[in-house]
Amino acid sequence: MSGKAKGRKSIFITGAASGMGRATAKLFHDKGWFVGAFDVNEAGLQSLEQELGSENCLIRRLDVTAKPDFEAAMAAFADETGGKMDMLFSNAGIGESGWFEDIPYEAALRVIQVNFVAVVTSLYCALPLLKATPNAMAFITSSSSATYGMPRIAVYSATKHAVKGLTEALSVEFARHGVRVADVLPGLIDTAILRTTPDRSGNRPPVSDAELRVNAPKKGMFRLMPASSVAECVWAAYGSDRLHWYVPSEIGWIDVMKALAPKFIRAQIKKRLLPLFAAQP
């Protein structure tokens, strides 16, 4: 068997240098899979390679907004796996927060490019490998903000709605190729995006790791969850036909309630979220 994979199952992960992607890479490695880890964070990738062992992974810088980067990454991955891909985890994402008009237009467009257009690109580029692999799966990171449009992260939330809709459509389309498609809708996950997402309206100072863990909710559907909880969800998804995965599972109730009582959900969002920013014009 050609390449480093040597017949092992293989997963291609974007946003693999940190957070949910890194946790997933480590879990699948522990399960005996060959891991393709891709990110713009080269230092993070190099430290991941040291953890996994170079014989067990392929690391490569990948700008998900550049289709040629994706094509080159897919070709390099195929060389190591004999043209197979058991699972695509299209996970890279960024955020912007603040009132809609405070977020620079260019920054909003970049959120769309990274969070949605790059997912589309990943699927176009990965599909030939997925089709060539029995029981293959494309798994995509959506968000709890795809259950209802969320104020102050409006464009981010819209991209995650788009991901959810794409997942639903392609889960039907790709079935004719024997390829499954599903997504994960994480809530509050302990990753760098919580600390690094700019607040363009300026009323939320940056928080440290310690402050985040002290002040974040400890219970309820929006309690702070470790990145490993999403990795475990990705692992469970590979052996399942479930379409949407919620982390924690209670977030799924928002989807249920939105269908049954959309006005109630909207009223609750206005009541609970907007007062948090009442001092901001």
Question: Language model features by range: what are they?
Answer:
Residues 17-18:
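Conserved glycine-rich cofactor-binding loop
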Residues 176-249:
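SDR active-site lid
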